[in-house]
Amino acid sequence: MIRVSQLKLPVEHSEEQFYQKIEKSLKIKRDQIKKLQIVKKSIDARKKPEVSIVYSVDVWVDKEEKILKHSGNKNAVCVKEKKYKVPEHGTERFNHRPVVIGAGPAGLFCAYLLAREGYRPLVFERGKKVGERTEDVLHFWKTGVLNPASNVQFGEGGAGTFSDGKLNTLVKDPLGRNRFVLDTFVSFGAPEKITYESKPHIGTDILSDVIAAMREEILQLGGTFEFENCVTDIRVADQKIKAVEINHNAWMETEVCVLALGHSARDTFEMLQKTGLFMEPKAFAVGFRVEHPQRDINRSQYGEKYAELLEAAPYKVTANLANGRGVYSFCMCPGGYVVNASSEEKRLAVNGMSYSDRGSKNANSAIIVSVTPDDFDGTDALSGVEFQRRLEEKAFALGNGKIPQQLFGDYCENKKSTAYGIFSSETRGETAFANLRGLFSDEMEQSFIEGMHSFAKHIPDFDRKDAIISGVESRTSSPVRIRRDEVFEANIRGIYPCGEGAGYAGGITSAAMDGMKVAEAVIRKYQPFQ
């Protein structure tokens, strides 16, 4: 096939214009095209007010080399179709079924691959099925009554279920895992456009249905799910995993245990540390969730002409400060909501979430400041966890259990806000005005303020006085890394640390890909379960 890149078209182009552009670029006629597939679609707004839609497409034709040479198009090349392949099965025999702890993206894709290959994984998830979990989350947002085992962090689908559902990743993968993840989502009900949009997202409403369909397929393939079953201990002998304890009262023997923990499984981290599993603190970032009117972001990114025509615009901003800290946007949610993402009593954390239509009137993003183990006495592997907890306890107290909010101008002046400016907050969960100064160290607070002013050089009025900040954004990534070797095993053999909670991913797609890598490691070593 021939891949043609840099096909620029007007924002409001027709299908006919799209085909004509391809025909012209390759100097071919319509009937010569046997098959066509969009590889990438992006918005180019670098030369505002002119904005273009840019495509890369794969075109199947006869006599590819001849057509390519005749076209003289420097943006066209012959490529071979790349399909993901599962490795050859190993020779060792299982005595017991492999266990996967956690049904987030890493755990689900690990279990899916194992189930497809006949390994009959047994998945333990402390939370509930996604439908029941959603009911618990909505109840929490309405009443403030938290279920510590079923919330925005815990339950089928993992923390990404209640997010923007972004599927882009910076992970380079020549083996095709990235495409396999996207194609798998499509096969379970996600829109096909996620396979080619430059910044794909799925939305929490669609993602919930996709996750449920994926679970049903894993069950059909011989896997098993045990919901509301938390792994509370492990049994180790001769530095090998022998069994896992469920809910403090039952043991399940296994020689393979995939730790697909989320970044909020703090009690599990504590339990694992006591067993002698090697783990270490890692750098992460904390800050606030910041809201702006989405229309203003659209104007900045697309220009006035296309502010209403195009989809809700994302942004990405970053600054490296003189004090050595980085300040940057994270998990930006166009047309999104700020949500109460707490999972522990008397502690409060926020996150951002969008539905598939990205229809909220506000844009929000975490604006976060980098922290290192030096900021939280990183001598203990779980010192970062305690740092997060202290921040969340302060946030809970500031809002009396509600999301504490403040206008950016008032934050700069160190005074409590009493009302919104010309736009109000879009939240899921109750809110209360508070003075958020004092939540972080003076240096971190000044870094946040400096970063906000810096970003206004790129996005006008980013530092507007009535921008709404909500605290605290503390769960940006795992504060620990569970060490693993080149075959993905921990120092306790048979334990496979995996995904975001173990410190090897950041986001839905990279976590899913890491789950696949761990499944491949198990497949290379063992025969399918008999």
Regions found by a protein language model. Give the residues of each.
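Residues forming the flavin
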Residues: 3-53, 57-184, 188-530
